[in-house]
Regions:
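Extracellular/periplasmic carbohydrate-active domains that bind, remodel
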Residues: 1-334
Length: 334
């Protein structure tokens, strides 16, 4: 239990090798289980995490934010998360280190702000860009609500429009921290895999994953036209967080600057209608999507591809025929 201060992680492992974390219950006001790498000459490596339950006012399982040396050979099994403000799974490579050979299977995330967030960024301006590749995430079930997931806990996660450590934190952020509130002018945020121009996220498998969103996205709250995806900021050096880009032009999954992505048996659904595509890809290459199920789509396109190459779909299930459901623009080819 680590709940005395808003910045308290549950369990931090820093620049360590050959570690096992099993059968723990963690309640934290910041990240639940968090691996960090503060030393460019060291690394978190050969770490096994199994059969843990996490409640977090930040992210449930996270690699980062500090990733100077990096992370390699990290295995996660049978993770349950609930009432988690940010992401169930957050893998962040932003400080020049490696993030490679990550294997995550068996995640149940209930009442969590986001399911999956992968980010290759460049916070260490002037230094090398780190790697983010060879990631396997499978057997995941996640429920994403419309309202702040950790509302009512003694110390809630800080609202995105305030700067922790500088701005005064309200006693009850959830009193105003609702999607669509003027302080947060964006709709419910999708899972995302986002790299940088010329530095893509590489070789990621998302398999046997089911994410059910609250939905409710409306143009009156925020709208990024599909013909103007450049309005989504790169935020190259910003602190990595699933909400770092603000409004995104998808309700289920957003992929940008990525290569070698494989979706296998992924189901995306919402409870309330959302006007955005379920999946939007921008600068994605050499990727395949098999048995992608989107049963609740209401508007076209269901999947939108911009500046993509060598993208294939097998067994796409939606209420619309494939020829209508998938829209490709610019140099997109099948």
């Amino acid at each position: 239990q680590s709940t005395a201060y808003w910045n308290n992680d549950g369990l931090d492992v820093t620049d360590s090798r050959n570690v096992r974390i099993t059968n723990c219950f963690i309640n934290a006001t910041d990240d639940g289980i968090c691996l960090k790498s503060e030393n460019p000459k060291s690394i978190c490596e050969n770490i096994y995490i199994d059969s843990n339950i996490v409640r977090s006012s930040a992210s449930g399982f996270k690699l980062g934010t500090a990733g100077h040396g990096g992370f390699r050979n990290i295995t996660v099994r049978n993770l349950t998360g609930f009432d988690t403000y940010r992401s169930a799974i957050a893998l962040e490579s932003v400080d020049g280190g490696v993030l490679e050979d990550i294997d995550i299977r068996g995640v149940r995330a209930y009442n969590t702000g986001n399911a999956i967030f992968l980010r290759r960024g460049h916070r260490n301006v002037g230094g090398p860009v780190g790697t983010l590749k060879r990631v396997h995430i499978s057997d995941v079930v996640a429920e994403i609500p419309l309202l702040k997931p950790d509302q009512g806990y003694p110390i809630e996660g800080p609202p995105d429009h305030l700067n922790p450590g500088f701005d005064r934190m309200p006693i009850r952020p959830s009193h105003f921290h609702l999607y669509g509130h003027p302080f947060l002018p964006y709709n419910l945020i999708p899972s995302s895999i986002v790299g940088l121009p010329g530095f893509p996220v590489e070789d990621v498998v998302i398999e046997n994953v089911e994410i059910n969103y609250g939905g409710g996205g409306h143009r009156s709250v925020a709208h990024i036209p599909l013909e103007d995806l450049g309005r989504v900021p790169e935020n190259r050096a910003n602190y990595p967080e699933f909400s770092m880009f603000g409004e995104l032009p998808a309700w289920g999954f957003y992929l940008r600057h990525a290569r070698g992505i494989q979706f296998r048996n992924v189901k995306l659904s919402f409870k309330k209608d959302d006007y955005r595509p379920a999946v939007t890809m921008d600068d994605v290459q050499s990727s395949s999507f098999s048995a992608l199920k989107i049963p609740t789509a209401r508007e076209l396109p269901v999947v939108f591809l911009h500046e993509t190459k060598e993208i294939s779909f097998t067994g796409l299930e939606t209420v619309f025929p494939l020829t209508e459901a998938v829209k490709r623009v610019n140099n997109a080819i099948r």
